[in-house]
């Protein structure tokens, strides 16, 4: 049996929907691995899969957008990448990403000039890591690509939840794409504030988002027990709004509740009573927009062309199964911009995140929205 990794791009509140039985995080797992393996390894019929795995479970995956039924056949309905696809992905994407990085590098002096408007006390390279690699490539540039019809950012499911799902086979050949690239956000967020980290997906980061996901799954390591007790006693359990209100208070007034400071220090967002990571306030939105505009002008058309070409022509499983091209393009874009980010790191243009054993490579920051 093959094993798979499941990735979700959620357009819903992950905390509020954590116990929803139709949340794909509560469905996808070992049982799914067995069914997907059957479909990969042979032309499994719908009836046969229902007999082997249960009609109700098969229907959950159809409703969840993982599978699609056509007459008596089951096909993949989400972007899926198998070991057999790895060589094609490496051959087609690496050189294109390097060329795009070349185009962008010519604009770096102009982009660095924009960063003069960021006065948060941190080096330009670290601010650029968060702004260019994260906020632009994994944020507003996404909106640009969507506006050009180059990718999908949303899919409404019968459950009422809006998300995109992506599946990778667990194998060394795909690891550099599935969890090795700098293209992954963790955001503990509400309408006012975000405690976030950006990096690769090669481990469980020591941050608020991962802490809450592990707690929901009942997989919280022993090292977090004191933090869990503090959270339960001081903030009414997993009430993130109360905690994030304290973060806003700290940044705007210099003070927050001692329990909030203890949590921020426990997760490395503060040290000795002070915030120790970059803070991005609404005052910096004009700078971020200016940088995004430079990126758009320098590589926007080239990225659109690259995605539309790759999503429709690559000889990979998802294309063969007729998965929506714009959903395929969404994940291909993650691979492309993650590869560009790796180029920016290796060329010394942005700060270099150090690898932490069991956690991967990432940097943290705080962003205020109001």
What are these regions (language model features)?
Residues 72-78, 273-282:
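Minor-groove-contacting beta-hairpin "wing" of winged helix-turn-helix DNA-binding domains
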Residues 13-52, 189-257:
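Short amphipathic alpha-helical interface segments
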Residues 47-70, 251-266:
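Short amphipathic alpha-helical interaction segments
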Residues 2-30, 299, 327-368:
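Charged, amphipathic alpha-helical stretches
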Residues 2-37, 54-98, 235-243, 370:
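N-terminal low-complexity, intrinsically disordered segments
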Residues 248, 255-268, 275-278, 293-306:
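Long, charged low-complexity terminal regions
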